[in-house]
Amino acid sequence: MADYILTIVEQVGLMFAELARLKSGEKPAGISVLCLRETGLPLDVVKHSSPETILQLLKTGGGTQYARAVLLAELLMQDADLSDAAGKKREAIIGRAQAAALLEHSIDQLSPEEQAIYRPKLEALTSDLERISR
């Protein structure tokens, strides 16, 4: 189990390192490439699907469903940050809502170590979304 935990954390770290190396104009395409490579789902499909549909698509990965959901949530958060920077507030809100739904669905299946990382992220997303909806 510890190897599995390390793998998720390492994958997220590698994704962030890969995104950091890209110039700002290349990041949206980089996120799309990472999304397809790491989760098997095209980012455009994800962005235009409900969280329930995304979770159904992730179930096809069997035992990797929760890890892929966490990776996808991370990518959606990165994409939401880019959308904010580009003035696309609606897209950013939708991306964060999708990320929150994926984390909410997966959080109890994660190890205590992973939960320690992702519960604060989920709480921050939820808080931001509640603030926006007021």
Protein language model regions, located:
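Residues in the short coil linking paired helices within alpha-helical repeat scaffolds
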Residues: S24-P28, K88, G95
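Start-of-helix signal in alpha-solenoid helical-repeat scaffolds, especially tetratricopeptide repeats
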Residues: I5-E10, Y66-E74, I93, A97, ...
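N-terminal alpha-helical interaction modules that lie
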Residues: M1-A69, E104-H105, D128-R134
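Residue-level signature for tetratricopeptide repeat
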Residues: E18-L22, L75, L82-A85, K89, ...
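Specific register positions within alpha-helical solenoid repeats of the TPR/Sel1-like families, i.e.
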Residues: S24, M77, D84, L103-E104, ...
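Glycine-rich, aromatic-bearing surface loops/beta-hairpins
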Residues: E104, Q109-R134
